[in-house]
Amino acid sequence: MLAAMAFVIARPAFALEPAQIGNFEVTEVAPGNYVHYGSFQERSPENLGDNANIGFIVGERCVLVVDAGGSLPVGLALKKAVRRVTPVPICHVVLTHVHPDHFFGAAAFLDEKPQFIAHRNYPRQLAARARPYLNYLRRDLGDFAEGSDIVQPTLLVDGRLELDLGGRSVLVQGWPPAHTDDDLTVFDRATRTFWLADLLFVDHTPVIDATITGFLAVIEDLRRIEADHYVAGHGRSRTPWPQVLDPQRRYFTVILDETRAAIRNRKTIQQATEEVGLSEGKNWAAFDAFHRRNVTTAYTELEWE
């Protein structure tokens, strides 16, 4: 089921020219599927919010972009990468979920007039988060945040959406609450390339912004999908599919089991954040930045079981 809507926060007429990103590389991971691998570093004026894996799929008729990056400069760099590969128009921009490292570059594509596609829950979450997200972006990037406007989706997905790029069929699929409550994946049927966005983290600490039990359930559903290639939301690996999901599943299982034990033993949420899952620290980048938040999310969910 689809719903249509449109809204853009306009860029001021006096806006400065956006900063440029140098050495913006894309890798063809399968025929017609191009990925730019973002940094694990925190957002800063040096990386301009280039912190997530983003990319595009090229059809004979048009291009589908998978996430737009964390700022206008990142989005513009991605659009230039598209143009280095093909002159065909960009017809779809899929915003896989409502996290700023994936959507703040969307304004770069407005002149192409694509459909901006998101999960049906995306607008509700964005309405609640837009102002703080913009404030944090300006805090982190300063003047380099100029023009990184919020672009609302024009097409909402409830379930599954099949798209024809011309000689290439692509499936956009919504998922139950997991990483967020508005997760989408993209599957290129021609090459069986699975773009998972933040339903898959490789080496970077996975993040729970919805439900740990839901995330574990979705991982089991993801494992059943037959794919020859995959793209994570963060990180990269040569581990075959679906075994690449195993470290993430292990991490969540450790948090789940140890948080339940902490609750049974009447530990406070503060105690849980200081004790649960610390054995996993050696396995993940950005562990200190995200792990305690994951335990907090898990505790608030599991204490009501």
Label each PLM-derived region with a short phrase:
Residues 60-64, 72-117, 225:
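Active-site metal-binding motif and surrounding structural segment of the metallo-beta-lactamase
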Residues 16-21, 28, 124-175, 180, ...:
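Metallo-beta-lactamase
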Residues 32, 57, 67, 82, ...:
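Divalent metal-coordination and catalytic microenvironments
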Residues 216-267, 271, 275:
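Divalent-metal (often Zn2+) His-rich catalytic cores of metallo-beta-lactamase-fold enzymes
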Residues 1-15:
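N-terminal export signals
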Residues 264-305:
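C-terminal regulatory/interaction regions
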